[in-house]
Amino acid sequence: MTPAVFNITLAFSFSLLGTLMFRSHLMSTLLCLEGMMLSPFILATITPLNTHSMIMFPIPIVILVFAACEAAVGLALLAKISNTYGSDFVHNLNLLQC
């Protein structure tokens, strides 16, 4: 395992750990999810350069599109929850009332 791949895997692991630890605020959870999406994007960008594979070049763009959609939905949810409840605490939400 090269040092770059190790660092990217470590960044993904820390983002996953942050998602599991900081679940009280929605904003910190969304930031950790963005870190989790950034790590596969960087890995998918570096891999075709090392393997000289032309078929893998569109994959980072697809990952980036999914990350942008996830960020847009997350920010829309954050704005709606902040306007409705006045804060972004996750424990104030009752998902069974939908």
Curated annotation (Swiss-Prot):
It is a multi-pass membrane protein. Its EC number is 7.1.1.2. InterPro entries: NADH_UbQ_OxRdtase_chain4L/K (IPR001133), NUOK/Mnh_C1-like (IPR039428). It is an enzyme of class 7 (translocase). It catalyses: a ubiquinone + NADH + 5 H(+)(in) = a ubiquinol + NAD(+) + 4 H(+)(out). It is found in: Mitochondrion inner membrane. The keyword Transmembrane helix applies. GO terms for biological process: ATP synthesis coupled electron transport. GO terms for cellular component: mitochondrial inner membrane; respiratory chain complex I. Keywords: Electron transport, Membrane, Mitochondrion, Mitochondrion inner membrane, NAD, Respiratory chain, Translocase, Transmembrane, Transmembrane helix, Transport, Ubiquinone. Pfam families: Oxidored_q2 (PF00420). GO terms for molecular function: NADH dehydrogenase (ubiquinone) activity. The chain crosses the membrane at residues 2-22, 26-46, 59-79. Belongs to the complex I subunit 4L family. Core subunit of the mitochondrial membrane respiratory chain NADH dehydrogenase (Complex I) which catalyzes electron transfer from NADH through the respiratory chain, using ubiquinone as an electron acceptor. Part of the enzyme membrane arm which is embedded in the lipid bilayer and involved in proton translocation. Core subunit of respiratory chain NADH dehydrogenase (Complex I) which is composed of 45 different subunits. This is NADH-ubiquinone oxidoreductase chain 4L. It comes from Microtus pennsylvanicus (Meadow vole).
